Amino acid sequence: MREDDIEIIYKNLHLDFVNKYFKNNKEKKKIHDNHSEWYKTHISSFDYLIYIFEDEEANFVAMTSYEILEDTAKINIYLNKDYRNKGYSQEILSESIDKFLNDNKNIKTLKACILEENLASKKIFENLSFIYDKTEICNDGLEYLIYRKIVRY
């Protein structure tokens, strides 16, 4: 991922989420600024890995990210809305996980945080052998379903 990907990611992945859950323009601006700073900080961090997926014409398709927490990695997938419901998510996620685990042999568990309403994500993670663990309120104040997959013992 490069710094010039930040606005593309925000526009294609985060803007709809922000508009849905935050109504105040001041809050939206703050979230946008936080988003930009977060990505700038994490691009060069050893505790985060971000993979960008593009189509043949170099259009943004998806992003997967991993936050490394000792022997656990928190995984996220964000798919451009223009590419949803076309069967790409599971293939992208599977490819991303394989690459990540190949490069990070110390990881034993993957953790996914999924909004309860996101049925597609639940199905994809379940298809990849993730198991529901618990419900948890995360950093953004929203409640998420926590799915885990043990990848090494």
Where are these regions (language model features)?
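Generic macromolecular interface patches on structured domains
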Residues: N19-K20, K28, S45, N102, ...
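Generic structural signal for well-ordered alpha-helical scaffold segments
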Residues: Y39-K40, L101
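A general structural-boundary detector
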Residues: F22-K23, K40, L79, A112
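Acyl-donor (CoA/ACP) binding surface of acyl/acetyltransferases
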Residues: M1-L15, I50-Y153
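A short, well-structured alpha-helix characteristic of acyl/acetyltransferase catalytic modules
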Residues: M1-S36
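Short structured motifs
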Residues: H35-W38, M63
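Short loop/turn motifs at secondary-structure junctions and domain boundaries
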Residues: K40-F46
